[in-house]
Structures are given as C-alpha cells and as structure tokens.
C-alpha cells in the first residue's frame, strides 16, 4: 500500500526522460549565449532594420572622458560629446575649434533626425534637446538615464523654426556637474 502512494505522485520513466531531454536542450541552447553578437553596434543595426523611421540625418553621439589642452601645460580632464555621422553629410556636424564643448549639429525644420546616444562616462547620463519640440520619450527626461556602456536611441522630426538650440545632459541631480565638465553642444 505504501508503495502505491509513492508511485502515484512520482514521475513515470517516459515522462522523466522527456523532461530530461528538454532540460538538456535548454542547457545546450543556453551554452551558445556567449557566442551571440550583442555589441551595441549590432543591436543598433538590428533596431534600424526593424524601424520604419527613415532619417535625413543619422548620427552617433558619444559622451566620454577626454583630455583637452585648455590652458598651457597639462591637458584638462573633461567630459565631451563626440559625433559620428552615418547619413546626412559630414558638414552637418561641426566641431568648434579650440573648444572642449560638443559638436554643433545642423538640422532643418521638417527633417527626421536619428541620434544614437552612447554613454561611455563613469556615471549615468541622458541628453536633453533644450527647446526642441520633441515627443516626451525623446526629450532626455532623467527617468531615461543610461549607465556607462549603455545607449539610448532618439528619433524625431524637427518642428522648430531656425534658431540656436543647445543640448546638454539631464540626469537627476547631476546636470550642472556634467555640463561644467564639458557636456553641452548646439
């Protein structure tokens, strides 16, 4: 009688082998994980293929530590934005001479802009497009901060008239210190 109670709640041989087979497949499939390309570039390329957003201007904006000769002597440690244009012409991004500030980004009303922000700094950050009329999720709100090594994709249409607008970091409680160190551009 005790033997019947034990076998009623137990797995049968076939069911056990079936579950063991599924487990083995799961372990083997999981073992390929380190070989899958999860680089930021491949993730952005995959997102581009899925997106129906066709930008007129497409660039990467990278926040990173740098050393810049601001005064004679030793270079000054700063944080700065660097841009790489993927589409739209290299003349759309201008690095101001003798400045540690970020590049000037030229965009026109009605253009669709894609900016791939990557944070290579030792603290969280996000980019706020000061004065531009963009959707809330694209406005660099502090709740969207990204950690070091992470990225945030901005896609928006420029709806503003011609003017000078600046962009800057917008992490909660760290906007000022990050701007003072050089994270700002036009």
Predicted region positions:
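N-terminal secretory signal peptides
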Residues: 1-15, 22
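C-terminal segment of N-terminal export signals and the immediately downstream linker at the start
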Residues: 9, 31-67
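Short, intrinsically disordered low-complexity segments
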Residues: 12-13, 48, 91
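N-terminal export signals
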Residues: 15-39
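Compositionally biased, intrinsically disordered low-complexity regions enriched in proline and serine
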Residues: 17, 23, 44, 54, ...
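Histidine- and aromatic-enriched segments that form or immediately flank copper-ligand environments
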Residues: 62-186
């Amino acid at each position: 009688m005790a033997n019947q109670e034990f076998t009623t709640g137990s797995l049968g041989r076939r069911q056990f082998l079936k579950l063991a087979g599924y487990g083995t497949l799961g372990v083997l499939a999981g073992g390929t994980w380190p070989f899958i390309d999860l680089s930021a570039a491949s993730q952005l390329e995959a997102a581009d293929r899925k997106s129906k957003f066709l930008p007129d201007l497409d660039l990467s904006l990278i926040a990173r530590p740098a050393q810049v000769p601001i005064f004679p002597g030793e270079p000054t440690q700063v944080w700065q934005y660097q841009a790489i244009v993927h589409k739209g012409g290299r003349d759309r991004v201008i690095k101001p001479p003798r400045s540690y500030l970020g590049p000037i980004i030229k965009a026109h009303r009605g253009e669709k802009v894609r900016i791939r922000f990557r944070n290579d700094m030792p603290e969280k950050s996000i980019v706020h497009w000061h004065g531009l009329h963009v959707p809330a999720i694209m406005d660099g709100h502090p709740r969207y901060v990204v950690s070091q090594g992470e990225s945030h994709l901005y896609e928006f249409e420029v709806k503003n008239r011609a003017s000078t607008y600046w962009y800057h970091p917008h992490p909660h409680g760290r906007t000022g210190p990050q701007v003072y160190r050089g994270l700002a551009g036009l």
